[in-house]
Amino acid sequence: MEIKTTAVAGTLESSDIQIMISKGSNGIEIDLESEVKKAYGDQIEKVITETLKKYGLENAKVKATDKGALDCVIKARTLAVAQRATETQDKPDLEVL
């Protein structure tokens, strides 16, 4: 699967995460901002990476701003941004979740 456009999903509200994705060429590169990065940063990055790979994306630049989102929210936002970036919103692949 290929990223066709830069896309954003999520908000900056409490218990949410905002994810922006754009084309990349060095695997999945994640720039994470989070108040809980020290404790949960590795887990947040793992959830984003696994979800993108399950969706078929191997190269992407990801900017994530976490406000205390649970894993299920991170997965949902990652799937939404991947669908928007690949312009496949009309063909949702919920198996990824």
UniProtKB/Swiss-Prot annotation:
GO CC field: cytoplasm
Locations listed in the record: Cytoplasm
Record PTM O-(phosphoribosyl dephospho-coenzyme A)serine, positions in chain: 14
Membrane spanning stretches: none
Principal localisation: cytoplasm
Keywords attached to this entry: Cytoplasm, Phosphoprotein
SS bonds (residue pairs): none
Sections of the chain in a coiled coil: none
One Pfam family linked to the record: ACP
InterPro entries noted in UniProt: CitD, Mal_deCO2ase/Cit_lyase_ACP
Quaternary structure, from the entry: Oligomer with a subunit composition of (alpha,beta,gamma)6.
NCBIfam families: citD (TIGR01608), PRK13253.1 (NF009726)
Function: Covalent carrier of the coenzyme of citrate lyase.
Family according to the record: Belongs to the CitD family.
Protein name: Citrate lyase acyl carrier protein
Lineage: Bacteria, Bacillati, Bacillota, Bacilli, Lactobacillales
